[in-house]
């Protein structure tokens, strides 16, 4: 995940610290309420959340996402949700209420239907089949549902995109997005170790395909390009 590097700004590592040391802003709901009370705020949609999973296991204890959604609902603040976990179903009642006011949409991240690959790429996340059930249940409850496919990795999971989109649409998803893998900062070294450990027979091929999609590098920081790549490989994924 490109977001791993954010942990380094807090003095932690992008490796195990990202997975094990969770930073909690316990007064998030109070801060959001204060922000929304600003008369100059124009109710531009906000996102939960681009750099973490707002329904990660810690949410069961802290309920920050629930409290933030309650504030958004109170102020009729439009919000989008991105998650890899079925924990979002806990808040179905609230999301259904927000859906009636057309102020919420949710994206479920699906990267593969290959369970072995999913466990290696995203341990402790919900299975693809469970995610499809989440899409179906929430869409039937009036929540606008979509999917995020990311990261798409050439030579590993990019060939599944059409199948994922079809399955998601069959379960009620109405929009889709994707991100092409980018190995920024420390993630370059973490991914390299993971790739060659788990896929020694074709790791070189995957690595070179990524390089071909980022102008000979494995990362591109240019806005508008970094998340989609460029060149023939990236175009085939798109």
Name the predicted role of every residue range.
Residues 78, 144, 174:
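Residue-level detector of anion-binding/catalytic polar loops
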Residues 2-107, 111-119, 128-140:
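Conserved Radical SAM active-site core
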Residues 113-115, 121-124, 137-157, 181-183, ...:
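Conserved strand-turn element in the central/C-terminal portion of the radical SAM core barrel
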Residues 159-238:
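Auxiliary Fe-S-binding modules of radical SAM enzymes
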Residues 86-89, 153-162:
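Active-site glycine- and acidic-residue-rich loops that bind
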Residues 20, 57-60, 80, 123, ...:
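Conserved aromatic-histidine-acidic binding/catalytic patches
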Residues 31, 35, 98, 120, ...:
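Residues that form generic nucleotide/phosphate-binding pockets
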């Amino acid at each position: 995940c490109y977001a791993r590097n954010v942990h380094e700004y807090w003095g932690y590592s992008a490796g195990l610290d990202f997975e094990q040391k969770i930073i909690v802003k316990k007064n998030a709901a109070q801060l959001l309420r204060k922000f929304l009370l600003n008369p100059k705020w124009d109710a531009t949609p906000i996102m939960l959340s681009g750099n973490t999973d707002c329904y990660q296991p810690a949410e069961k204890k802290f309920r920050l996402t629930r409290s933030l959604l309650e504030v958004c609902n109170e102020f009729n603040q439009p919000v989008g949700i991105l998650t890899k976990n079925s924990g979002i179903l806990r808040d179905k009642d609230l999301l259904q209420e927000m859906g009636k006011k057309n102020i919420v949409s949710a994206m479920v991240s699906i990267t593969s239907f290959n369970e072995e690959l999913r466990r290696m790429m995203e341990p402790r996340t919900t299975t693809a089949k469970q995610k499809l059930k989440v899409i179906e249940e929430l869409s039937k409850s009036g929540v606008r549902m979509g999917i995020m496919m990311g990261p798409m990795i050439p030579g590993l999971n990019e060939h599944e995109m059409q199948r994922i989109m079809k399955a998601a649409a069959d379960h009620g998803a109405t929009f889709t997005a994707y991100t092409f893998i980018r190995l920024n900062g420390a993630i370059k070294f973490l991914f390299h170790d993971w790739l060659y450990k788990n896929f020694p027979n074709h790791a070189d091929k995957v690595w070179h395909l990524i390089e071909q999609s980022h102008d000979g590098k494995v990362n591109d920081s240019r806005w508008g390009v970094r998340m989609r790549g460029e060149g023939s490989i990236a175009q085939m994924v798109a």
